[in-house]
Structure formats: structure tokens, C-alpha cells
Amino acid sequence: MVNKKYRQDSKDRYQYKQYIYRSIGGIVPPEMAETVTANQTAQWEAGFTPYHKLRLAIKEICKTDGIPNIKWGMYIAFGEKLLKSYLKMKAGSASSDMIAEYINNAISAFSSRTGISQETAQKIADFITSNY
């Protein structure tokens, strides 16, 4: 089973694995493997935390709303898709009205397709807009 918890040694373990992968066979010089590994580790670390924090929050929201844990995956998928789109729109030139309209449309479309609770989806959207 893969360990999906971010621990104190997660960054070091990831960096070690990437260095081994990059330097296998001796084709790549060690300095280049170190540079690539350091850059890739920084990108990994920057992208890991937002989604991890979101997953933990979604699990708590689902627990408090009484959603069976077998359905949590749908809520996590919704939250990750919404976060990706939200960050893209926020970085671009989208106005707050456009973002709010997109979120409302995403909630209704996803809930009609999958049958998830609109109230819970709205709580997830509120978490995303207030924390990112």
C-alpha cells in the first residue's frame, strides 16, 4: 500500500527516489541529476500541500454531513477538479462574478451527474474560495 501521508521525511524520500531514478546507468552526470532532482522536488512540494489540505478538509466535511465514506471519493474528485479550475481562473483575468458563476454551474452539473449533495458540494466550494 502506498503511504499517502505527508511526513517529515517525505521530501527527503521523494528527493532520494528521484535522484536514484535520474542517475541510474551513469548516463547523466551526478551534478545534472542533483539539479534536476532539486528542481523536481521543489515543484512536487509546492503542488502536494494544497491538494492534501483540500482532501483532509473534504473528509471532515463529509464526516460532519454524514456522507458514507464509500462516496467520499466523488466529493474529493469534485473538490480537486474545482480547485484546479479555481486556481487557474484566479491566476487569469476572471472576475469574481465569473468565478462564482463557474462554481455554481460546476456544483449543479456535478451533482446532477453523480448524485452528490449540493449542500456538501457548496461547503467544499466555500472552503476552496476562503482558503486558496
From Swiss-Prot:
The keyword Transmembrane does not apply. One of its GO terms (cellular component) is helical viral capsid. Its main location: virion. It is found in: Virion. Self-assembles to form a helical, filamentous nucleocapsid mesuring 900 nm in length and 24 nm in width. Together with capsid protein 1, wraps arounds the DNA and maintains it in an A-form. Capsid proteins probably maintain the DNA in A-form by non-specific desolvation and specific coordination of the DNA phosphate groups by positively charged residues. This certainly protects the viral DNA under conditions such as the extreme desiccation of its host. Heterodimer composed of major capsid protein 1 and major capsid protein 2. This is Major capsid protein 2.
